[in-house]
Amino acid sequence: MRLVLSGASSFTSNLFCSSQQVNGRGKELKNPISLNHNKDLDFLLKKLAPPLTAVLLAVSPICFPPESLGQTLDIQRGATLFNRACIGCHDTGGNIIQPGATLFTKDLERNGVDTEEEIYRVTYFGKGRMPGFGEKCTPRGQCTFGPRLQDEEIKLLAEFVKFQADQGWPTVSTD
């Protein structure tokens, strides 16, 4: 018996026949799948779709990890720096001194500070009421009176702030 599937290749249609040659020898398959109707094909797809979907979903984090270990460590280091230098004014992405200058995407875009480079520049040199934290920040009145941050630390902060803004400021553990 031979099943004819419209648009199916000879290989595909051979999968669903009751007799098939194996390695050039006329050998009968012990448990052939016989499809007589489109209903049988629909039934087969309905039975196979849920387990195949589950397998694909289970394997997808392995094949496509959301971020690398290095990015995770940088985010944690950025969170630690943020908690040390920025959280006094910008707790959970807000701004207790100037409410329209939060670290949420909408305000960052409106204020022209929506890229890592711009966040770095504002963190280094300051802007408006925000003091600069860079080692070479000038003029003196625009810069923090507290400890200055190294370039790499400001880069980590800029990456962290951009990442958090893109995520809507979820809680990040610094452990």
Curated annotation (Swiss-Prot):
Heme binds at Q98, P99, G100, A101, T102. GO terms for biological process: photosynthesis. It is found in: Plastid, Chloroplast thylakoid lumen. It comes from the Eukaryota. SUPFAM superfamilies: Cytochrome c. One of its GO terms (cellular component) is chloroplast thylakoid lumen. Keywords: Chloroplast, Electron transport, Heme, Iron, Metal-binding, Photosynthesis, Plastid, Thylakoid, Transit peptide, Transport. Its main location: plastid. One of its GO terms (molecular function) is heme binding. Heme c binds at C86, C89, H90, M130. The keyword Signal does not apply. InterPro entries: Cyt_c-like_dom (IPR009056), Cyt_c-like_dom_sf (IPR036909), Cyt_C6 (IPR023655). Binds 1 heme c group covalently per subunit. Belongs to the cytochrome c family. PetJ subfamily. Functions as an electron carrier between membrane-bound cytochrome b6-f and photosystem I in oxygenic photosynthesis. Cyt c6 and plastocyanin are functionally equivalent. Monomer. Interacts in vitro with LTO1. This is Cytochrome c6, chloroplastic. It comes from Arabidopsis thaliana (Mouse-ear cress). The gene is PETJ.
